[in-house]
C-alpha cells in the first residue's frame, strides 16, 4: 500500500489515510484492549460504518496514519478533529492499534508531529484532548508532550461494568513553541528580527527568506 511522508520524525512518519486502511482499522476498533482506552467500547464497528465515518470526518479533520520508517508498517492513527478556523482550536485523537508498538514512544513522537503541524501550519492556538482516568500511561505521555489538565467530567463513561471520569487536557501554541523555538534559535549563526518574528507567530515567511536553510536537531518536514 502506498503511503506518503507528509510529516517525518525520527522513527515514524505521518501519511494521509487511505480508504484501503478501513479493514485494519475495523479490526483494531473491535478489540476491547484498544477501545477501552479510547472510550469507544460500546460502539459496533463494521467496514461500512468505518467507511462512513472516514468520509464524514474528512471535512473538518486532519487525519493521518502512523507509519514506521524502518519497515513502512502502519501501527496506528493520529488526527486533529473538529478544526475551528475562526477560534483556531481543534481536538487531538490518537491510538496505537498494533500492540507490539505500544509503550515504546511511538505515540509521543506522533503527538509532537501533529502538534507541530497544527500550530505551525494550521495556525491553531489551542489543541485539546480527552482521556479516561485509568489510562495512566497516556496521561503521562500527554504531560510529557506539554498538555495540562484543565478539568474532568466525573463518572461519565461506563466501561466493563464501572463508571470512570473523563479527563480534559489542552495545550496552547505558546506552550508548545517554547522548546520548539529554542531548538531552532540554537541552530542560527545569525538571526534577524524578521526571521524570529515569523518563527514565533507562525506567519508565512516572506519571499525574501524562502531560500534560507535552517539546520535543526529534528528531521525536516518532507
Give the residues covered by each predicted segment.
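A short, well-structured alpha-helix characteristic of acyl/acetyltransferase catalytic modules
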Residues: 1-51, 175-182
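Glycine-rich phosphate/pyrophosphate-binding loop shared by adenosine-nucleotide-utilizing enzymes
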Residues: 12, 73-76, 164
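Acetyl-CoA-dependent GNAT
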Residues: 43-101, 172-176, 181
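Conserved acetyl-CoA-binding loop-helix of GNAT-fold acetyltransferases
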Residues: 103-117, 139-144
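Conserved GNAT acetyl-CoA-binding A-motif
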Residues: 120-130
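Conserved catalytic-core motifs of GNAT/GCN5-like acyltransferases
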Residues: 128-131, 148-164
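Conserved active-site tyrosine of GNAT-family acetyltransferases
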Residues: 142, 147, 169
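Short amphipathic, helix-prone segments within low-complexity/disordered or flexible regions
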Residues: 185-189, 194, 200-220
Amino acid at each position: 500500500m502506498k503511503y506518503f511522508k507528509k510529516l517525518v520524525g525520527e522513527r515514524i512518519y505521518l501519511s494521509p489515510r487511505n480508504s484501503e486502511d478501513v479493514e485494519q482499522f475495523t479490526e483494531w476498533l473491535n478489540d476491547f484492549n484498544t477501545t477501552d482506552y479510547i472510550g469507544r467500547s460500546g460502539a459496533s464497528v463494521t467496514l461500512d460504518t468505518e467507511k462512513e465515518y472516514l468520509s464524514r470526518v474528512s471535512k473538518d479533520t486532519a487525519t493521518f496514519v502512523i507509519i514506521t520508517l524502518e519497515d513502512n508498517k502502519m501501527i496506528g492513527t493520529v488526527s486533529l478533529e473538529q478544526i475551528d478556523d475562526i477560534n483556531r482550536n481543534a481536538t487531538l485523537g490518537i491510538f496505537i492499534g498494533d500492540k507490539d508498538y505500544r509503550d515504546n514512544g511511538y505515540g509521543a513522537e506522533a503527538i509532537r508531529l501533529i502538534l507541530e503541524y497544527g500550530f505551525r501550519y494550521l495556525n491553531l492556538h489551542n489543541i485539546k484532548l480527552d482521556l479516561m482516568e485509568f489510562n495512566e500511561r497516556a496521561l503521562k505521555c500527554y504531560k510529557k508532550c506539554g498538555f495540562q489538565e484543565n478539568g474532568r467530567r466525573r463518572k461519565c463513561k461506563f466501561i466493563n461494568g464501572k463508571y470512570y471520569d473523563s479527563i480534559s487536557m489542552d495545550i496552547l501554541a505558546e506552550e508548545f513553541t517554547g522548546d520548539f523555538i529554542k531548538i531552532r534559535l540554537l541552530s542560527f549563526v545569525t538571526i534577524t528580527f524578521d526571521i524570529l518574528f515569523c518563527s514565533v507567530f507562525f506567519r508565512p515567511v516572506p519571499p525574501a527568506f524562502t531560500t534560507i536553510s535552517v539546520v535543526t536537531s529534528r528531521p525536516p518536514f518532507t
